[in-house]
Amino acid sequence: MKKILYFMMLAASVAVLTCCSAEDPFEEFVDNGNDSWNGGGMQTNGNSATIGELTTFDVAIDRTTAEPTEAATAYLPDEEDALEDNDFTTEVSIDLSNPVAKTENGVEVTVSGGHVTANHGSEKKVCYVVSGTTANGSLTILGEKKYAVKLSGASITNPDSAALNLLSGKRAFIILTDGTTNTLADGTGGSQKGALYCKGKLLFNGSGTLSVTGNSNNGIHSADYIAFNKGNNIYVKSTANHGIKANDGIYINGGILNVEVTAAAAKGINCESNIIVNGGRTTVLTTGDGMYDTDDREAKGAAGIKADSALTVNGGELWLKNTGSGGKGINVDMEARFNGGSVYVITKGGQYKSNNDTSSPKGIKADGNITVSGGRIWVRTSGYNGEGIETKKELSITGGEVASYAYDDAVNSKSTMTISGGYVYAQGQHNDGLDANGNCYIKGGTVYAICSGSPEVAIDANTEGGYKLYLTGGTVVAVGGLENGSQLSQSCYQSSWSANTWYALTVGSNTFSFQTPSSGGTGLVVSGASQPTLQSGVSISGGTAYFGGLGISGGTVSGGSSVSLSTYTSGSGMGGGPGGGGPGGWR
């Protein structure tokens, strides 16, 4: 898998940005080896994005073991789920290269060819130490008590069923022995639910590596919940269905987790309940196209992460890329909460159509509310009808950084949209920047929105449905103006603008500098807590970079010329027609 550069963003930039390039403003941030500006004065090799590349960053499988330092407190549903609170002192060794039937420490081990079954019955504190290789075998665990499976250089391939079949129904602690490589794979035959199947809770620990390949169904499947913890280095691939599947919850507390799926409408990480991400680095690649579900009678697309309940991101990193038609990066049936961490999403496929139904590509989609209070979210969609961030209900941003560069609407809510803090960038290549189908409230934060051109607008609300844009606070830059009928409690000002140019907007003692796109809507609207001043053609040194270097807070501004600002009032001719254009396909 091709490696790409990942440049970490620091708070203070030491680079100097120059203005008035004749090229597209994004092109100067394309990776040029070690000379790329990163908005933080530091360059490090790794995987995924390059700061300054909102429109060009990539996502690739990265099995390097260095975990992100940013992490929230680990979450486990039950105190018994912590390995350190358990004592598995009764070890039973199983060598799959030369399996031996035996009864040891109350554990019965039976062997049939390369297939091994171990039953610890009512014995407590049992730890199976598994090593060796089998190309036509399996390991099945039975028992009435919780247990541990320590993988210490085990390689299991079962052409006919699951490679590791944990049928106890009790807690299963998978311990990846440090310094060992372990592999599990099934074949294309059989009715197994996964190459690694667990009937009970599945809890990963240890700092070894594990590769799981599902060729018949899922890669890893638990009928209960799954927890990944710091130190894990796990790669999962499925050519037939989902990568990782859990019925009752998925909790990513740390570790390195890489997932690839290729089947139509398959999900990289799929949970029938809640998903919580607190740490680690999770990378998911999905390549399957959409498909028509004859049972549900609807078109469906693949997704990097799919939660049937809620998704919460508190820390760590998510890197998601979907190249199939109708695909999503994140698809949540209930609420999506982003409290911290970093989320990077790419979708490349276009809309999928079948049987008079459609599945449209989305970076992040939630049927419930979306709330952002911290962290960083970058989204890019390039396929036809692809929206960046979409909720069927309300959107609330109170902090963090949100940047969406989308084919269709960059950020869309079916109901109310409220921005009261944070830094928000929204560029719709063929539609609005921010689009609320209810009221849109901007109360604080810094908002930089760009639309494609008339009749679209940078910031839109559903005036046709009787709703409005209410601007009462914050710092606002809108390339393409505001929807007609806006209620502007905070004064707004307008001017013309030049493409590919750096501007500095100063409000009181605070300066926000931004680079304009190569094309966009007519007219520029700006607003701040007090009357702003605007300069064009400036250079900026220092400051804090946002949106991949397209916006800078603070820093030292030099050069340029003053821009004449005139008062902007709603309906003054810059905004588009009736707002609140319908979302580009809810599914």
For every predicted segment, state its role.
Residues 13-14, 282:
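Residues within alpha-helical transmembrane segments of multi-pass membrane proteins, especially transporters
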Residues 1-5:
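Positively charged n-region of N-terminal signal peptides that target proteins for export
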Residues 21-587:
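A composition-driven surface/loop motif
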